Amino acid sequence: MIIVTGGAGFIGSNLVAGLEEAGCRDIVICDAMGEDDKWRNILKHEIRDIVHPNNIFVFLDEYADDIEMIFHLGAISDTTETDTDLVMHNNFSLSRELWRWCYEHKVRFLYASSYSTYGDGQSEVGFSDDDSPEMLAKLRPLNPYGWSKHLF
């Protein structure tokens, strides 16, 4: 089984499509469907289940032996969200818990970061793939979303 957090969003649903195209048929989406039209993004996909983020750890524990990999794209991605506690809890703390769960259960974990970690790109760093601690320390995210992705 492959789990895609944020799987009903634009990028996540396209990842699900790519996985299906590659022959994967045991896909679970973890996403908060809410009141918007995200359900339309997954309408054409044959997925095993949709799990709300509040229930993900119960689901993981129940199906631990079946899980091959987690693609972690789920996040509050609204760069105008001003509730920093909410963004940090969802994007940093829960990501860390999910990574720990994967580590403890020997499940592959792929984390999607964001260009927002760079900030405005005007520092001496610019946009770089250098992930050394020295270079990462120079990044200056501009909002809670970018900061939450940078910290992880």
Predicted regions: what they are:
Residues 2-24:
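N-terminal Rossmann NAD(P)H-binding glycine-rich loop of SDR-like oxidoreductase domains
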Residues 5, 30, 70-74, 109-115:
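SDR active-site strand-loop-helix element
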Residues 24, 104-108:
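A short helix->loop->beta-strand "cap" motif at the edges of active sites that frequently abuts
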Residues 28-56:
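Glycine-rich phosphate-binding loop and adjoining beta1-alpha1-beta2 segment
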Residues 44, 53-90, 119:
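NAD(P)H-binding glycine-rich loop region in Rossmannoid oxidoreductase-like domains
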Residues 75-85, 114-143:
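Active-site "gating" loop of Rossmann-like NAD(P)-dependent oxidoreductase/epimerase domains
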Residues 90-95, 102, 110, 148-149:
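Short alpha-helix in the Rossmann-fold core of NAD(P)-dependent oxidoreductases
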Residues 104, 139-152:
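Active-site Tyr-X1-5-Lys
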